[in-house]
Amino acid sequence: MNYKNIFLVTLLAVPLTVLEVSAAGNSDKLKDTIIDKTIQKFEDGFNSLFTNTELTLEGRTGSDPNFTLLTVNPITEDEAEGNLAFFQGSIIRQNNRDTINLGIGYRQLSDDEKWIYGINAFHDYENTYEHSRWSVGAELRSSAFEINANKYFAISGAKTGKNGNTERALDGYEIEVGGQVPYIPSAKVFAKNWKWDGYQTADTKGNTYSLQINAPIAPNITLEAGTKDFDTGTDVDFVNLTYKIGLGGGKSQQDEMVQSLIADQAFNTTSMKDKMLEKVRRKNQIVIQTSFTASAGGV
């Protein structure tokens, strides 16, 4: 539901509410009822907009914090066949640059519900200096293991950027493998290899290692910390704190709320049916080359 729809629902709520309470003779009661019901209908519309939305704060060495607002919503879904088409959108504020990411994806659930197979495509646009790119990606996920691969294609060419410097969005790729920490189903480790193709200069490449934890007592909060290990140059440490604005009340999320920190089995191989709307793991910031240095928007 978009903002226009929320406004229309709220607007229509007023006359409908008046009809509901027209028999009430008390004008104060009528006024209070109209206000209460209008607020309730607005809250219902607002909550539905943020059913699967999250806010992330990222801090890293040598850079100001950045903020990301991201949402994932279904386009079409066939539960009987176990497939889903979805939309993922986000907006990022980093280093006084705003980047918008718009993507669509398709996911298929395996017959035993233990695996998700997915493909996706995105368009990224940084409106401050008009950089843009496309990407295609693929993913394979279970509750204990996952692999994510993305290929990025710059399409905007040279731009006049900050302080009059020439900037370019870069092509690149990343391949990431993730796995559950044995006996701790709320924790995962990730290792990612990436490379960005330098324009008339050396490529920028390296690896990223991170640990992600979902607190069992607070399933709407995720903490991920790690380091970006450059083949050349100074490594960068980072911490991401993500808050899910709307949990939606799904069964899997309720289960996460009460799951134990330590499990009886080394790896938790559970159904992935309720994970079909998890976000695509990708590099949402456009990697920019300025004065022959890849920054980010950066790596």
Where are these regions (language model features)?
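Gram-negative bacterial Sec-dependent N-terminal signal peptides
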Residues: 1-22
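Flexible, glycine-rich linker and terminal segments associated
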Residues: 23-47, 155-190, 196-201, 216-224, ...
